[in-house]
């Protein structure tokens, strides 16, 4: 178990450093968690794995804190292979742009682009259909109008 715990700690440190750089923060994973908590529900809907990612981040941070601060934990079964795999996977997701915040950013950009394209299409449709003009007055109506002008 000692090797697994040490491997986990090293991978967690890599993830923490990446989160610090990614979020321009001194807090790393803790800041990522805080920003997830501050993210509005309307944005969370873009990420199918939002709740799982949030819970897993909190869990791996807890595991790391146990290993770092509790006496005798390095020789016990605190961390699992799944914990190690998840930390590595989340690191890779940040690197390849599929972490929750990047997914939200991409989805909102696509939404904005779609809205812009729809607006342009609407404007093009309006431009293709000229405004309906008033029907030209009949000869009789023009004659009556001219007579009225003559007497007024």
Region roles according to the model:
Residues 1-47, 51-62, 66, 74-152:
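Amphipathic alpha-helical interface elements
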